């Protein structure tokens, strides 16, 4: 779009997709380490394959297995949203937690004598080994034990992926959105970060609810113009 903006002040206009804006926002405001790098899904698969022990090229070539990896990446980002109290409407790829996973968490909570709620989900996610030990002696039938094991394994892999990114200053595309949303949402007075009085969004139908929420948070409260095209 830049060549079509015939204005001497075009250098002050940001043109790009939401992920690119979020990356610029995070680095410009010192919200991530300066040496951080952004990774794509292929990089993410390579990282996770370190923990599964699988050949990453096998994963790339196997649609079913690659989808299972994607579900783990989505689980990592969704657990961040649950922990941070993001509205349910902003969560995407909710299929990363299926009916068996819910049943497994309910069973774990039953064994531990606690209510099944968001706090319990986050606690199980953050303490996989503890809950694995606590449920090891559970007398539930074989089927229930298997779904608990699968859930905890999936959560463990998501945690390992998360820690690897943190230790190596890596950000995936989910992180760009989540960290930007967190920062803007924590600045309700609009005093810490720049807001925009003119925002134009093209191909709005391609944006998910989290991206739209970020755009809303980026918009100044008064004297604003927001144009959505699609």
Kindly give the residue locations of the regions a language model identified.
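Conserved P-loop NTPase-based nucleic-acid remodeling module centered on helicase motor cores
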Residues: 1-97
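Conserved helicase NTPase motor core
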Residues: 14, 40-44, 143-230
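Conserved ATP-driven helicase/translocase motor core recognized via long
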Residues: 56, 60-61, 71-167, 210
């Amino acid at each position: 779009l830049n060549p079509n903006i015939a204005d001497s002040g075009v250098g002050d206009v940001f043109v790009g997709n939401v992920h690119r804006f979020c990356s610029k926002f995070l680095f410009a405001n010192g919200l991530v380490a300066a040496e951080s790098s952004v990774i794509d899904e292929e990089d993410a698969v390579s990282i996770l394959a370190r923990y599964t022990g699988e050949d990453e090229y096998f994963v790339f070539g196997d649609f079913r297995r690659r989808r299972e990896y994607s579900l783990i990446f989505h689980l990592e980002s969704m657990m961040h949203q649950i922990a941070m109290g993001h509205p349910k409407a902003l969560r995407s790829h909710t299929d990363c937690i299926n009916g068996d996973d819910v049943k497994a968490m309910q069973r774990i909570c039953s064994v531990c004598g606690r209510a099944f709620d968001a706090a319990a989900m986050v606690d199980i996610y953050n303490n996989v080994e503890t809950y694995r030990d606590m449920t090891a002696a559970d007398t539930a039938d074989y089927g229930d034990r298997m779904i608990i094991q699968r859930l905890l394994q999936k959560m463990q892999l998501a945690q390992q992926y998360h820690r690897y990114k943190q230790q190596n200053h890596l950000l995936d595309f989910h992180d760009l959105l989540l960290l930007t949303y967190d920062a803007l949402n924590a600045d309700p007075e609009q005093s810490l970060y720049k807001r925009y009085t003119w925002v134009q969004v093209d191909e709005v139908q391609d944006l998910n609810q989290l991206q739209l929420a970020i755009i809303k948070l980026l918009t100044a409260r008064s004297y604003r113009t927001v144009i959505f095209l699609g």
